[in-house]
Amino acid sequence: MNNYFLRKENFFILFCFVFVSIFFVSNVTIIKCNNVENKIDNVGKKIENVGKKIGDMENKNDNVENKNDNVENKNDNVGNKNDNVKNASSDLYKYKLYGDIDEYAYYFLDIDIGKPSQRISLILDTGSSSLSFPCNGCKDCGIHMEKPYNLNYSKTSSILYCNKSNCPYGLKCVGNKCEYLQSYCEGSQIYGFYFSDIVTLPSYNNKKKISFEKLMGCHMHEESLFLHQQATGVLGFSLTKPNGVPTFVDLLFKHTPSLKPIYSICVSEHGGELIIGGYEPDYFLSNQKEKQKMDKSDNNSSNKGNVSIKLKNNDKNDDEENNSKDVIVSNNVEDIVWQAITRKYYYYIKIYGLDLYGTNIMDKKELDMLVDSGSTFTHIPENIYNQINYYLDILCIHDMTNIYEINKRLKLTNESLNKPLVYFEDFKTALKNIIQNENLCIKIVDGVQCWKSLENLPNLYITLSNNYKMIWKPSSYLYKKESFWCKGLEKQVNNKPILGLTFFKNKQVIFDLQQNQIAFIESKCPSNLTSSRPRTFNEYREKENIFLKVSYINLYCLWLLLALTILLSLILYVRKMFYMDYFPLSDQNKSPIQEST
């Protein structure tokens, strides 16, 4: 009987112990979570205070810089008289571009928004006009390189509020805010509201900073490609339409009258550079001037779009020879072959031919094409694409051990091709060299060809104004994908031909807004790996402490499970000790005499 009450009493005590333990653990958990949250808030406040201090320092520096602007502008006016002969690097503002065609599918730069500033990564897009990015409070935005822009952190931000129909520039009033809405040809759409703030461009080569106020779009909804891109926003570089929101590039040159209204883009396989105020002659390939003269002489002797002087195929040692020559390049603007921009607000130019092995495969007399750094690939009409693809397919050999297939290609004659080539022998030589060097080719999605090497692949030649033929090398119209080089051409969409990034690559594309013209100069563009990009306080850190991202209910359950596990172990241990004390083994009740008998 006594044992029974003892057992009951112990289990009651044990139950109380379990209850108190669970209550204690749960409260400790909540307290710890609150402490973590408070620490995060304190860190955020400290960062905000540091940002404000930085902003005050920047304002002081701006005042000092503004005092020197008058003196510098006077010097600029004197220097501008000699700028027609030479572009001085000190007068240029250079900005590093990051990204590539394969992994990112775009190139982007970093600019500062607000006072104190918050860094935002923006895709460089000459095919659009808006400057926009996600803002704090957006529930339909993706995870990008930086956290959404926080308007409350900036002392200079101002939302563009409205009352039914008083929005400027013909904008719509939605929810007492002027609506921002942008649609793109690939199907992406973003919308939100407009706000104004200070835009600052920190140049890596020039201590002076370009800064001005700009009306920008705050994303409250993203979809399609924008939802999954790594860069935070978009920076449009096209021109202002009548009665439209003033664009970035127009405001930039309006607030820096000392600069020439010229900018250039130079991208390599990884990264590149944006140059404001001119272009960089030092990047020109050393034999560029010789090439232009040679091409002009070739064009003067051409007939009906076919070049009479033999255009060589891309050779393995071309780049080595170009770099080894020590030829002085003239910096005179007159040596650059300019192309007129054919439309008012976007960068369209006319092309008059596209040559492959000396044969013009374009069936139209001319074609308007958009020069667009926001498009990854170059989009051409379907008939031109099919012609190029036909010849590249012949040069694409999947299995070097398939003797039947190889012999079949080697037996091709010029008459058996869809369109005879002017330099058919060069085509056959390239095919033989590809086979001999085992330049294997594979096909990826949508039949896109990829070669292991650029060797013996053909150059393309684009005919521009004044019958000037510009070389388009495989290192440009193909892009690096792991250990292969893949075709960067696609069929046009919505009847809109585009010269995309695969045309920009390894060229300095110069936009002269004063003369309304564009030039393409083969250049050795700088490389900037994304891994070398400076870090910032407002970046999105993917490797944060995982426990800070777990919800409180999940964290509570985790602690509860741990507590129950510990308590269960204690119960089993106490139970074992209890039975050992109150229920001794039968052998323990026997006397020593009984055991001996």
From Swiss-Prot:
Domain Peptidase A1 span(s) in chain numbering: 107-521
EC number(s) recorded for this UniProt protein: 3.4.23.-
Location of region: Disordered: 58-83, 289-323
Annotated compartments: Endoplasmic reticulum membrane
Residues spanning the membrane: 552-572
Compositional bias annotation for Low complexity: 299-311
Residues in the Cytoplasmic compartment per record: 573-597
Residue ranges of coiled coil: 33-88
All ranges on the Lumenal side of the membrane: 1-551
Cystine pairs: 135-218, 138-141, 162-173, 167-178, 266-525, 396-441, 450-486
Active site: 125, 372
CDD domains in the cross-refs: Plasmepsin_5 (cd06096)
Pfam families: Asp, TAXi_N
InterPro entries in UniProt: Aspartic_peptidase_A1 (IPR001461), Aspartic_peptidase_AS (IPR001969), PEPTIDASE_A1 (IPR033121), Peptidase_aspartic_dom_sf (IPR021109), Plasmepsin_5 (IPR033866), TAXi_N (IPR032861)
Post-translational modification: It is not clear if the zymogen has a cleavable propeptide. In vitro, appears to be cleaved between Asn-87 and Ala-88. Cleavage of the putative propeptide is dispensable for catalytic activity.
Bilayer topology: Single-pass type I membrane protein
SUPFAM superfamilies, sorted: Acid proteases
GO cellular component: endoplasmic reticulum membrane
A GO biological process held by the record: proteolysis
Cited function: During the asexual blood stage, plays an essential role in the export of several proteins into the host erythrocytes by cleaving the pentameric localization motif RxLxE/Q/D (termed Plasmodium export element (PEXEL)) located downstream of the N-terminal secretory signal sequence. Specifically, cleaves after the leucine residue in the RxLxE/Q/D (or RxLxxE) motif of exported proteins including RESA, EMP2, EMP3, KAHRP, RIF/Rifin and STEVOR. Also, by regulating protein export, plays an essential role in gametocyte development and thus parasite transmission to the mosquito vector.
Domain comment (free text): The transmembrane domain is essential for localization to the endoplasmic reticulum.
Protein name (Swiss-Prot/TrEMBL): Plasmepsin V
Protein encoded by which gene: PMV
